[in-house]
Amino acid sequence: MKTQQSFHVVAGFVCFPMSKTSQSRCYSTLRDFLIPPSKQKFVPSSGTYPKGFLAAGAHAGVKESNTQFRDVALICSKTPCSAAAVFTTNKFQAAPVQVSKQVLEAREGADITGVVINSGCANAVTGKGGLEDAKSMSAKVDECNGTPSTSSKGPSTLVMSTGVIGRRLPIKRILNAIPVAHSNLSSTHKAWLNAARSICTTDTFPKLLSRTFTLPSSPNHTYRIAGMTKGAGMIHPNMATLLGILCTDVPISPAALKPLLSHAVSRSFNCISIDGDTSTNDTVALLANGAAGGQTITTPSSPNYAAMQTVLTSFAQSLAQLVVRDGEGATKFVTVRVLNSPSQADARAIASTIARSPLVKTALYGRDANWGRILCAIGYTQGIQVGTVVPERTSVSFKPVDGSEELKLLVNGEPQMVNEERAARILQDEDLEIVVDLGGGEKGGEGMAGEEGIYWFCDFSHEYVTINADYRT
């Protein structure tokens, strides 16, 4: 007898029941957005978006196999913005990365009007023709905005692309889609969600967040921040690790915006890893149009700077964690926290090494409390100070999400009697925290706390191999 499946819609996307291990992946062909049940909770049903910003998505057919689904997104501001961005360190920087850098440099981070993004083709390693394609995308948006790129400062729109490397864009189709997207620009939640959906590739759900907050100088004044990201594979920091667009209506000068973003990225997008690969296209951009009014943040010494830094960093961390939760084939969201290190740099290096380890990631997928693999990763971490890792001081434990007592695996270099049944129960949960205590945090013998490093990562499953083996086919 056939069982009847119930289909429903979350925020305009089809959702359906699936097996625990199965996930809907677009691979290299965009298709209807089937959101796995376990991911539906991450898709917002509403939002509060920054004043003066508009969003939209449109269909261009960047991939010939995509005959109807949106693959071009626009984020525009009604008034010029301050803007800053952090880019990939990959030597093969994609054309949109190079063009966006040029736009920001020519305009000194001021008078930026928006961002245009396409999915389905990375426009990376495409030579001079690829650069011209990226420039034409920026110019087309400027034309639609009524701000021609013929000004002495050049174009005012940033460009991002994601997808397969080494192929030219179907630029005519994209240039035809940009005016369509522009005509659909809106401040509604649906418009923002459509834009977030348009930039997805192997993502199983659109990653969109929005928040309201206040600042010390105007405690009764409401400000807003919104952001979207895409990314599920080729994720490892060196920044930025993916595509991210953040917008706020707080008035912030270009001089203050760049350090705000750099600090936030270093503690969010640069603290995640899915597979250890750094893309050619990684970009995270922050736009601030000041539409909400109030006192302008001009320097790090401005009254609202510290509070804005806290808001932005927390928001960026939430966005970055969504990327990990949608890691290709992932079944686990893992936090690794390294405590009592002589320096934060060493703590982060160790956390990063654990997060990248294929042996750690596969053990977690197999629900195997194989702490020896964690110790191995700690021990071969490169670039840390002599004496940071002392086996006789090192402790490792699993911290359950239910708040129960930590499961101690290693204490001061001594292996513990591990209750394997409890370990298996802990590893059944989607979320897990690994705590590494280096026991070397005392400074000057005064018992002061040492430095901490944190990373978020996911496991490796059979599906990760399937997705990436089939990516171009």
From Swiss-Prot:
Tell me what reaction this enzyme catalyses.
Answer: N(2)-acetyl-L-ornithine + L-glutamate = N-acetyl-L-glutamate + L-ornithine; L-glutamate + acetyl-CoA = N-acetyl-L-glutamate + CoA + H(+)
Q: Where's it found, cell-wise?
A: Mitochondrion matrix
Name a biological process GO annotation.
Answer: ornithine biosynthetic process
A molecular function (GO) term: L-glutamate N-acetyltransferase activity
Record's keyword annotation contains Transit peptide: no
PTMs? The alpha and beta chains are autoproteolytically processed from a single precursor protein within the mitochondrion.
Q: HAMAP family from the entry?
A: ArgJ (MF_01106)
Q: Where does substrate bind?
A: 201, 230, 241, 328, 468, 473
EC numbers listed for it are: 2.3.1.35, 2.3.1.1
- Enzyme class at the top of the EC tree: transferase
Please name the source species.
Answer: Paracoccidioides lutzii (strain ATCC MYA-826 / Pb01)
- Keywords in alphabetical order: Acyltransferase, Amino-acid biosynthesis, Arginine biosynthesis, Autocatalytic cleavage, Mitochondrion, Multifunctional enzyme, Transferase
| Other comment | This protein may be expected to contain an N-terminal transit peptide but none has been predicted.
Q: What is this protein called?
A: Arginine biosynthesis bifunctional protein ArgJ, mitochondrial
Indicate the family of this protein: Belongs to the ArgJ family.
Recorded GO cellular component terms are: mitochondrial matrix
The positions annotated as site (Cleavage) read: 240-241
User: Subunit info?
Assistant: Heterodimer of an alpha and a beta chain.
Site positions per UniProt: Involved in the stabilization of negative charge on the oxyanion by the formation of the oxyanion hole: 162-163
Q: In which pathway does it act?
A: Amino-acid biosynthesis; L-arginine biosynthesis; L-ornithine and N-acetyl-L-glutamate from L-glutamate and N(2)-acetyl-L-ornithine (cyclic): step 1/1; Amino-acid biosynthesis; L-arginine biosynthesis; N(2)-acetyl-L-ornithine from L-glutamate: step 1/4
Q: Does the keyword Amino-acid biosynthesis apply?
A: yes
Main subcellular location: mitochondrion
| Role according to the record | Catalyzes two activities which are involved in the cyclic version of arginine biosynthesis: the synthesis of acetylglutamate from glutamate and acetyl-CoA, and of ornithine by transacetylation between acetylornithine and glutamate.
The domain of life for this entry's organism is Eukaryota
Which InterPro entries does the record associate with it?
Answer: Arg_biosynth_ArgJ (IPR002813), ArgJ-like_dom_sf (IPR016117), ArgJ_beta_C (IPR042195)
User: Which residues are named in the active-site annotation?
Assistant: 241
- One matching Pfam family: ArgJ
